Amino acid sequence: VFAPGVDHHVYLYELSGNFVKGWDVPKSDNDIVSKIYHFRVDGKDYLVYADQYRLYILDRKGKERVKVSTLLNLSGNTPLYLTRQNGQMKIAFSDVNGEIVLVDFRGRVERVKGEKMVGGGILNVEDINGDGQDEFVYSRKDMLCVYDVQGKLLLEKCWENAELSFPYVYRFSARDSRIGVMDGKGERLFLLDMKDVSKGFPIRGNSPFSITFGDKGNAGFYLFAGSDGTHLLKYRVLR
C-alpha cells in the first residue's frame, strides 16, 4: 500500500502494516497531486506520480528510473494515463491551462493544445474510433470534446447550462466504443459515439452509470444508474 505523507515522502506498507523492506522512501519537492500508478512497459516496472511541478518515474524500489527535467503546472487530483501514440508508450495528463502533456519513458516531454481546451476540464484517454491510437476525451462545464494526438478536434458537443461530469468510455465491441457523461445540473445521462447522441438519450439519472451485458435469456446491454439518491434505474441500451 502506497501512502504519501505530509512530509512529501512516499511510504510503502505490506498489508500487515509493516514497512516493505528495501523501499527507498522517495521524496517529492511539493505535495503530491496524483495517485501513485504502476505501469509495466517493455517488461519493466514503473511507479509514476506527480506533484504540482514535477513528474516522478521510479523503479520498483523507489529509486528514480527516468528523470523528467521539464517543469509542469498541475492542479490537484490530476489523473495520469498510460497511452500508446504512434506505436510508443507515453504518460498522458493535462495541466492547469488545459494543455495535454505527453511524457515518454526517456523523460522527453511534448505538449498538445487542443482547440477550445482551457483549464478546469476533465480528461480521459481512450481509443474511441478503433484506429489503434488513443484519443483525448475532454469535458468542461457544458462542453464535451474529443481530440487526436495533434490536437485536432474530432468531436464537439455542447448542452446549454449543463454541468458535465467525468467522460467515461464504454466498449460494446472492437468497433463500437461510446462516451458516457452525466449532466449533474439537469440530472440527465448522455451516451454518444463519434457522430451523435445514441438513440433514446438523454435519459433521466444523476449518478455515474454502468453498462453490462445481460445473461440468462436477457441478451443485450443494460444501463444502471442512480436517481434522487434513493432509486436505482435500469435501462436497456438500443444499439
Regions found by a protein language model. Give the residues of each.
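Extracytoplasmic/lumenal domain signature
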Residues: 1-239
